[in-house]
Design a protein with these regions (language model features):
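Catalytic histidine-centered segment of alpha/beta-hydrolase-like enzymes
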Residues: 158-174
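Hydrophobic "lid"/C-terminal helical patch
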Residues: 71, 173, 177, 181
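Flexible "cap/lid" loop of the alpha/beta hydrolase fold
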Residues: 19-23, 28-62
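Glycine-rich nucleophile elbow surrounding the catalytic serine of serine-hydrolase chemistry
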Residues: 10-20
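Core-facing hydrophobic residues within beta-strands of well-ordered domains
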Residues: 3, 28-29, 152-153, 161
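Conserved serine/cysteine hydrolase catalytic core
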Residues: 94-148, 154-157
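Alpha/beta-hydrolase fold nucleophile elbow
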Residues: 2-12
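Conserved alpha/beta-hydrolase catalytic His-Asp/Glu region
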Residues: 60-114
């Protein structure tokens, strides 16, 4: 048994999963930080909206140069920190006897439980961080989140960042997360 509760921080799908854990195991979670992750209303119709999954089967490339040239952020966005993208790309690949491939698990979306109709009910303090250029910021989903969670969740925006806040503004994001964790401790 844990001696103290934990803080969860998640981006995109990770934020969605962190909110699920905070809802299902409130005795475990002290605070929740969600970074540009949509929490959809229970009546959201997933079948009417385009999804980024499932992932495609693993593809092999003949050279490191070729696979690195294919690296993209998903969803696509411009990024001014090329050095950071190169770093992420370099650590997202591995060489095998069949060639170069991405490290992701192509079984991920088959193993995840869909949360259609799930009503998130976390009660811990929460912070939602979004980039000012994120498509989520002006969406109906954001309006739902602000309405449903305004009593327990703060909403903060990092200027000049899109969905991949941690790539666009890593220092600003780290500072905001650290400030919130200090406030909660």
């Amino acid at each position: 048994m844990l001696k103290r509760k934990i803080f969860l921080v998640g981006h995109s799908l990770g934020g969605h999963l962190a909110a699920y854990i905070a809802s299902e195991m409130p005795e475990l979670v002290s605070g929740l930080i969600i970074i540009d992750s949509p929490i959809r209303p229970p009546d959201y119709d997933y079948d009417k909206h385009i999804s980024s999954g499932p992932l495609r089967p693993i593809k092999y490339y003949s050279s490191k140069r070729e696979i690195l040239s294919r690296f993209r952020l998903m969803p696509p966005q411009e990024c001014k920190n090329d050095w950071y993208l190169r770093f992420i790309a370099e650590f997202s690949i591995k060489e095998t006897s069949d060639g170069w491939r991405w490290k992701f698990d192509d079984r991920l979306f088959r193993s995840l439980k869909r949360l259609d109709g799930y009503g998130f009910l976390f009660s811990c303090p929460a912070l939602f961080i979004s980039g000012s250029d994120s498509l989520l910021l002006a969406s109906k989903i954001m309006k739902y989140m602000q309405s449903a969670f305004s009593e327990i969740m703060e909403f903060k925006v990092i200027k000049d960042a899109a969905h991949h806040v941690l790539v666009d503004k890593p220092l600003e994001l780290a500072e905001l997360i650290n400030m919130e964790l200090k406030k909660w401790n």
